[in-house]
Amino acid sequence: MQCCTTPLSPHEQRLQDKIAGKEDSFRKSHERVFNILDSFDGKRPRIDVERAKLFTDSMKETEGQPLVLRWAKAMKHVAEHITVYIDDDQLICGRGGCPGRYGVLYPELDGDFLDLAIEDLPNRTESPFTITEADARVVVEEIAPYWKGKTYHEDLNLALPSDVHKLTYDDPQGLKSRFIVNETSSFRSSIQWVHDYEKVLKRGFRGLKEEAQEKIAGLDPLSPRDNVEKRPFLEAIVIVCDAIILWANRHAKLAADMAAAETNPVRKAELETMAEICAWVPENPARNFYEAVQAQWFTQMFSRLEQKTGTIVSNGRMDQYFWPFYRKDIEEGRITEESALELLECMWVGMAQYVDLYISPAGGAFNEGYAHWEAVTIGGQTPQGLDATNDLTYLFLKSKREFPLHYPDLAARIHSRSPERYLHDVAETIKFGSGFPKLINDEEIVPLYVSKGASFEEALDYAVSGCTEARMPNRDTYTSGGAYINFAAALEMVLYNGRMLKYGENELGLETGDPTRFETWEEFWNAYVLQHEHFLRAAFIQQHIINNVRARHFAQPMGSALHDLCMKHCLDLHTPQIPEGINLGYFEYMGFGTVVDSLAAIKKLVFEDKKLTMQEVIEALKCNFEGKEDVQQMLKSAPCYGNNDEYADSIAREIDAISVKYGRRYSPELGMHNDVRYVPFTSHVPFGKVVSATPNGRLAWTPLSDGSSASHGADVNGPTAVLQSNFSSKNYGYRDRAARMLNIKFTPKCVEGDEGTEKLVSFIRTFCDLKLWHVQFNVINRDTLIAAQKDPEKYRSLIVRIAGYSAYFVDLSPDLQNDLIARTQHDAM
């Protein structure tokens, strides 16, 4: 616990009040959502096998048929037979699994991991799940055997050339990751996505079904393509629209049955209303705010049942597509701000019960703390370029300040004309201390997307998805998860001539020579460039194969029904190249700050100042600085990224240039944009576990730097210098770049009071002016994190910002907890 003179964030203060047994006035006035929250909060999520079992049963019966038809029929089978639930106190219904927190299985993706996962998941350090003995038997005896030899992961594993395979996997079956050039496509069928929810609210699935039926009627009966490709696609759209309508109607019947048996008149009326709403939406257009929320939730949840899309389907621009319904209901007196907020918070607790499940060990390690990226996007601009904030925008921010839940993720779009009131509310919400909202910059993203082929209207209407990504519904298309590349490993291979201490004499990289014989910085730099490009080569070969393999394994009829280009061309979203679409792919840079600082130290101390020899550096690294602490301190004192120091920042810019130039040269061969991105999720922790000590003074097997953030403790010139280094390290002359995740940690004292709010608003303006992609904040005292480590039960509800999402601190592994504690804590701006 902090000293009484140490300012606490409101989140910390609420937690201390709870520990002290003080009454929570907000809880008292929001009994409904807290009753739901209490039913599952703090409990380990359970694996629910119904979706996997029903999906598998259907796929067994449809072999030989077009994949898109098989998928639609499988979803119809799921809709008919999956158990439907309505939680006590809930006003919004539709879930994909058992009561409480749950995760579902997608055996079509990575079913070859199932046997291993059933044993591993309950005992994992990162994001464990439970499973009943009966469900485990179903998985082992009924689900897994069918998918052996049929999964996407197995196909990919066999397709990779041997030189790429050895950088990707550490075993022939591809069950163990090497954490060097890591493919991520096998634990999600695509990267993050945002549906066009507005289409559902305005037209309903009956309207989408009728569109498909009209297209079927217009097909040329003699055309080979119309018969072989278009007809199965359109028939699948009809089937899947019927499926989600059926699923909603089953909820309507359940609500009506529950209402008939209910003795409490208030709850009886609520259930009757729910029955009426579920019988209307999502089949038909929504008529009011309540129906709009329910229709969106049905769409979102059925999409999650349909496929493992990215790291959960995001919610899009909720303050825009819900706004007409909210405004009309407010004006006509049907709802109040508080009743609307209650509906949204019922949705939030529904989101918090569905937990994204990664059955592969790598997937679990990459997405710690039950990672979730169902981003709700607020603010920004309209397609016409006007400021988009409205009353709902502020309602979402208010909910984040009042309701202590780590769901949903909240992303606030910022632009140069964002209103002062909006920035003030955003700053106050950040100051609350639970990590919301993350900030996304229109001034970087809109022109960048226009340069990649979007119209201004499309780019201005982007929605945040995943960790820091942005999607343009109806224009960009599905892309498989890209490679995560451990460039700190590339640096290590320069030091050990193509080898790594973790993997012994295995020659994984190029033999670039004995670094102790390099006489100039240019020789060392050129060796690094060769290793760097060797990794990029492997990543692009991976992606080329992935693009060809994916369409053989996945279809998404419901997602396709919601995409204009898919319907126009009668092509599934998983089609590698959809006419008029923009395919926004990426590869991930791991250890950016680690590599920059290491190269700066070698250049400065070895080749320029000659204070150390390369031999002395390597000897210190091999013994992990034990007995060589003086060398470690010298290395740490070299210029570092994150301080607005051109010496280090120029190296960062050159490293970035290697990647963007490679992407520009070879992306056209992939038929997509394959751009450099700096968004590690939590993978900088497992990637660090294979990298020995590095020349920036980092100890062996410890986490790498995360995203485009500075190395822990290296950024000593304040947070504005961090922004300036981030700006200086980018190659703005290239469009071949994507998201950059940036973490900043403030003490509550730094942003205390009205003055602190104004300083934070000014900081946000600077972020916007520098055209940086993303920034997110932790506002917390280090002592609170240490206290939570020592007494996790008391701090069960402590929420922190991790990697584009917020999570309960106690749900993180000790390694990730320590990584968060070690982040530089800024106490002044």
Curated annotation (Swiss-Prot):
Induction: Highly up-regulated in the presence of isethionate. It catalyses: 2-hydroxyethane-1-sulfonate = acetaldehyde + sulfite + H(+). The keyword Lyase applies. Keywords: Lyase, Organic radical, Pyruvate. Disruption phenotype: Cells lacking this gene lose the ability to grow with isethionate as the terminal electron acceptor. Residues 31-699 form the PFL domain. GO terms for biological process: alkanesulfonate catabolic process. The modification Glycine radical is found at G804. This is Isethionate sulfite-lyase. The gene is islA.
